Amino acid sequence: MVIKNIDAATVAKKFLVRGYNIDPKAAELICKSGLFSDELVDKICRIANGGFIIEKSVVEEFLRNLSNLKPATLTPRPEERKVEEVKASCIALKVIKDITGKSSCQGNVEDFLMYFNSRLEKLSRIIRSRVNTTPIAHAGKVRGNVSVVGMVNEVYERGDKCYIRLEDTTGTITCVATGKNAEVARELLGDEVIGVTGLLKGSSLYANRIVFPDVPINGNGEKKRDFYIVFLSDTHFGSKEFLEKEWEMFVRWLKGEVGGKKSQNLAEKVKYIVIAGDIVDGIGVYPGQEDDLAISDIYGQYEFAASHLDEIPKEIKIIVSPGNHDAVRQAEPQPAFEGEIRSLFPKNVEHVGNPAYVDIEGVKVLIYHGRSIDDIISKIPRLSYDEPQKVMEELLKRRHLSPIYGGRTPLAPEREDYLVIEDVPDILHCGHIHTYGTGFYRGVFMVNSSTWQAQTEFQKKVNLNPMPGNVAVYRPGGEVIRLRFYGE
């Protein structure tokens, strides 16, 4: 797209991100020409004859040759669509729910009570829609089988039996699980909400069924679309280990500059990019992080991030959610970036909180950075970082993004629990653990979207082996394509 009103500093920045310095007089010449575009910058870089400084004479010769060509010679990029089309794309994206601008917690006792009551009520309502339950305090009055729903207070074992302490707003009860139910009970997490059906013997309920809130089979049903969504996370702009060359190759793919015809056709159909947190590497996140930073100023990291997102074709809508490395509060749910940081990014970027529930042309996407994955893996031995989609299944099964209170994931006691999965999404997108995995669970597409950071010294010490440069490209209701930009 040709931009008429452009200043020399912006022109210089465009050349700088491509590895070139431009003479100030040459930049002014481009401004006065009224022909500035990303394609023009690319073409000038190609004729720079290997030099790293773009002289005025180079620009003069280029513009002179350009004036002798037909206007159609500068082929419009895909992003040069009509303004109306871009606006229509923005309208098609709706933020349904996130915490931004709604946080009210002060951390007092009342906040904690309201937080846990909100969680209990939301998840109990889901279970009660499938099971006819009785308040725990009244369970003793029921003859035969009885069903209760409550929050898991404690799970312990004695012999081959597993005991579950369950509580609701009326009281507590001990549930006894044996056989296959005991296997299920051993994987229960503190503070999650479940239902139990069984026979009351004395003061204990002997379980014959444990009920999770879970998502219904087939989720919301298949929603076929003709566009593709790219899922990214953990870009870690500002890190010494940020994969600059791989990112550049990814952007070139989006522009249709690399790959075969099939790959280019795929890139043309990408309408949205969703980034699930850790946009920058941050400051003071872990011991010795300063040794891993290429940019030690947090604002500078976001400027660097914004300049890289600015290279993405403008017709692609980018949705950005924060993570634990970003400049927002550590406790979840996290709000979107503050205005000063948001102003750095191009206009095709939509900022949301963590988690965020968005509607993309009728496709419901739940974005969550995924910090609780660490907690879930530590509690359920069969799960691992190698298959993040298996962990995400557990989040959907429990209808909660971070069910464990008091684990590694700090949770803010908001008066409403924003991490309950009330509405079943079509897509659940997470990141955080720097590995790649996709799958389907009861009709919900799950994706954990890798990273753009190679292994850091700190990660070597804690034996974390990332799987960087993997990109999931998904057509709602259709196929998922995995692209590898690292190690190929």
Swiss-Prot record:
One Pfam family named in its UniProt record: DNA_pol_E_B
Superkingdom assignment: Archaea
GO cellular component: DNA polymerase complex
Gene Ontology molecular-function annotations: DNA binding; DNA-directed DNA polymerase activity; single-stranded DNA 3'-5' DNA exonuclease activity
Chain segments annotated as transmembrane: none
InterPro entries: DNA_pol_a/d/e_bsu, DNA_pol_delta/II_ssu, Metallo-depent_PP-like, NA-bd_OB_tRNA, Pol2_small_arc
Keyword check for Amino-acid biosynthesis: no
Gene3D superfamilies: 3.60.21.50
Family matches, as CDD domains: MPP_DNA_pol_II_small_archeal_C, PolII_SU_OBF
Record's keyword annotation contains Nuclease: yes
Documented EC number(s): 2.7.7.7, 3.1.11.1
Cited PANTHER family: DNA POLYMERASE DELTA SUBUNIT 2 (PTHR10416:SF0)
Family the entry assigns: Belongs to the DNA polymerase delta/II small subunit family.
Assembly behavior: Heterodimer of a large subunit and a small subunit.
Protein name: DNA polymerase II small subunit
Organism: Archaeoglobus fulgidus (strain ATCC 49558 / DSM 4304 / JCM 9628 / NBRC 100126 / VC-16)
